């Protein structure tokens, strides 16, 4: 069954004429995340604060960046302009770091590995150039723009990820308390995986993998937006715009948006899903907004009433409640949040998501 609605034409026209950004957003190193990254624990009673209170350092080369991401202690690391990794590679990020971008900050041909760490913030950075021509499916190098392993309290905010090799943001090895917010994912295949493998310990994995995705812009991506094994995920106020393209792995059409597997509990609300359009829909080719999958199926529910999702030129979303009439999880048991009206999501997210949107005024006097 295809879900089609009359406001599609007006929405497309709106997006065409809102290509110019509405302006920068004032930001601070004291900003706090919304979502699971905000949840306090015994070792982090204020939730995720990154390197707040540590030395502020400005970096302009890959070597300078790695020097401080691998240093012990708190640091606020400011990426000033474009950093090119030659050869392409990943670098490790230790605990208690804030990495923020200024002056159209870019990381080209490089990725960040947050492994065995806690309390890391990454904001306002554009990632590109990590696609390996000799490894289009990411099987040889397995490079991710951001790879989170066995880590907790991570906030990834206002970043842009363009056509990478494997994952854009992958969350694995029992990582926990993570928020991905206001990011833009463009022309990427396997966008964001939560959970390393179907073979992970189900009890341990079920206690980990608490992840929030909100106000992200998925543009012409193919799958895993996100795909969750075990754990919990709250997916709200994201914009999915699925145009035709030739994907990294040879796919022409995006496949699915949010997927739940291995008993994961996923609640999807206030999102706007835009499929390929009328011609493809009438030909029987359509985008699947939510999917239940895996050798052990996951659970997934949709918001209702003021929290409903919108679906345009999409297949019927797949759902599987834990208990009929109840959401797969109640995020407000963990944190407070405010939903934007779903009809406003396309403009809000297109205008606000991605790198280059934040201005950190306190950094102007720190140089």
Curated annotation (Swiss-Prot):
It is found in: Secreted. Optimum temperature is 90 degrees Celsius. Half-life in the presence of 0.6 mM CaCl(2) is 110 minutes at 95 degrees Celsius and 15 minutes at 100 degrees Celsius. Half-life in the absence of CaCl(2) is 5 minutes at 90 degrees Celsius. It is an enzyme of class 4 (lyase). It catalyses: eliminative cleavage of unsaturated trigalacturonate as the major product from the reducing end of polygalacturonic acid/pectate. Residues 1-27 form the signal peptide. Its cofactor is Ca(2+). Keywords: Calcium, Carbohydrate metabolism, Cell wall biogenesis/degradation, Lyase, Metal-binding, Polysaccharide degradation, Repeat, Secreted, Signal. Its EC number is 4.2.2.22. Ca(2+) binds at residues 144, 166, 170. One of its GO terms (biological process) is polysaccharide catabolic process. Cleaves unsaturated trigalacturonate from pectin. Activity is highest towards polygalacturonic acid, activity on methylated pectins decreases with an increasing degree of methylation. This is Pectate trisaccharide-lyase. It comes from Thermotoga maritima (strain ATCC 43589 / DSM 3109 / JCM 10099 / NBRC 100826 / MSB8).
